[in-house]
Amino acid sequence: MARQRKKLLIVDGYNVLRSGSRYRQVTDPDYTDDTFNVARETLINDVINYAGRDWRAIIVFDGARNAFSTGEAETVGGVRIMFSPAGQSADKVIEKLAHDARERQVETLVVTSDATIQDTVFGFGVDRMSADGFSREVGMHYEDARLDETPKVAQKNTVASRIDPAVLAKLKAMRDGESEPHGR
């Protein structure tokens, strides 16, 4: 049986941070570098968890104004993270990634609320999701995972149910004022 190709998830990093409801703390005009870095790390972790085994994922951040940005990707938790090269916008990188994926007939989803990117990639036949839609999906993903870990049947856990039966017998005997438990 042939191995099924993974789908490609492309995330417009800064757009999602500024537009997704999960990351609203970044839109505060008084955000600090620390707050922004925490939000970026949260997004990266969210993409890692959302992508799981079904998606190959890449997050593209805009590095156009950074003279030192090379456009090289780094992999964290199976997700490729890149800043666009100096002088090139993240939008152009995302459009090229989406176009190339469709040329290879790879099912692709682009997460952005940027209307221009949405229109461009939709023209390539690529699926799209808004930043807020992604925020909701991630929230539901975490909620489903949390529910999967909860016991399905209510179970009463008492100290007596977890203690060695011989020790329990001795404790009962002491409680009842007996010097030795019955049966000895």
Question: Regions from the language model: what does each represent?
Answer:
Residues 2-11, 15-184:
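Nuclease catalytic cores that cleave nucleic-acid phosphodiester bonds
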